[in-house]
């Protein structure tokens, strides 16, 4: 935002008719012969009243034709000075000054002209000569002081200004002090002195004008505009004051309001003010500079009002018109791009501006670039930036060279960015370590503890996150970031009523907030219907379990939540496969209800199964219970279990069964699951299956995850010689690796690929141990939080009854919310 250039608005001694002392000098300098000349006398009177052109034309013509007397030469210099013809004064002085009788008035005129032309040294020499002739002349001393200030000789200017106190009227002396301070960059001291001058001479319009100039220079824009109402200022200065007042509203609009209801009041005032100014200035050719500047500054008011599309539209219009958009307005445009989920454009602007002036970059500027890079999926660049920022700022700094140290807020910004970069890089353990250290050393910092709770939740510890947030709730109970994070934790804990209450409050209070919108979106998705589909298609397989040409599909449609905890569902399933004894087909139609509450999940299902031997009633009850953040106990019981092998169903054999399992999940990187599953077949066979599965993350980065999996499983059956695969005893050992690699990601849209490889062994009673080989490749797509779908091509060689069979097939799944 442009500042008022006080040096261009400074008052000078250019117009001598404003100063009584100068008029007295001129009157005394007129020779008797000139006074006797009536025409010449009339021209001089005209000049004194401000019309200098006639006498200047007369003297110029006479000088060219007849030459001028010494007194006329002195008059010529004086009147040219009145007219503000500084270059002409200097030329006349150089030509005739040496021949003239030295008087303080002529010397002052020449000194003033040199000063206006920024020729400081000749001006200072003339001021000193004039002061030697009239040391008690306050006007000369004042001119000398102001020229010293212009020349950058601040110390001497202050010394000479102190000497002038006894020579000048108090108001004039304070005004001189103000000029010296302003020239040296002490703008607030200048305003203080101008305030004293104004108090001493409230009716002096010159002092009032300079006071307004200093108010504007110090960005005290609204008082400056109000004080200017009684003055006759140049239109360009008046427009600048109006623009500054509107720009001040823009600056204030970014400051947190006292209450949430008032947060847009100032921004709306700024927009209304700009609408008025733009309408007023648009048709005026002489006001186009002010008009264009107002268009640029208005971008800030639009940004503060969260009219991001308007910010981008106006910014692009300015660019298309070839307008030069200053850096601060470009940052506004970049912020709007980031809000509108166009991080590539935001990163380009932030990166260019930060690189252009690295020494002027603030921690806030680097934070903007960090999030633009992160949201543009330039995670490695963002991590490097966070590392640099964390090392750039010291923990504490000295203020005003005092011996005590003050805490440095920028240091905390750098450390927070570093921790956030670990989250983006999926190094949650390091992010937790860093945030724990920061939060425990600053327990009263609610923001740090909210960030720590978010990492707890990402690591699979919603109860620990809930406890952390509860501890800091008393610091600022109505904090929006706190309520949003509490909402996500409630969702993780299946506290649906709490989720709705928090989401309602947050979106009502801050509908423009991106974080609030994302939270509300998550809540809306929770309240949608859900469609689940999974299936498989055999390509080249002839194993005894699934048969050849096998195909299966299962679908379930869940209703939106009912009374917070309930969902109804209906399902359909179809399986087919070709076996030696014929083609097997199974059709299922099911319906049921689901209950979800804190720590508990229950699902009950009634199904009609038709597998070629009439319609049969199937029942299932499944449940799990969370003991804490690490342990979960679950199980199910079923009549006509859906896990019954298709080959058994084809031969008219059904099974009842169940399972019991216990899962331990240390964090997002490590888990174990032990299970046992007994089954009773209608042919009298009793089967007991057991297993232990483990997963350990080996590597993780922003775009990849590598997990090692281990499967230990076995079974035993009470009968042999049955028409389905039924080993007396068997045992499987299968370690494998799974690599998940992100191909594309843009906010909630992601496309990834998966690689699987495993090699182990299989032992079956009465047969030799033989190897198992597994390979797989798949891809997944997730979109906007409502769609998640994947497909995988799998290859397996598995021994059955001592013979290794090859199985090639495709599995697929889809989850869609609507």
List the predicted regions and their residue ranges.
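Short, low-complexity, charged/polar intrinsically disordered tails
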Residues: 4, 9, 62, 96-98
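Short, intrinsically disordered, low-complexity terminal segments
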Residues: 13, 17-18, 29-33, 98, ...
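N-terminal leader-region detector that preferentially activates on the first domain or presequence
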Residues: 27-30, 34, 79, 113, ...
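N-terminal leader/linker segments that initiate helical-solenoid repeat arrays
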Residues: 29-84, 90-93, 105, 240, ...
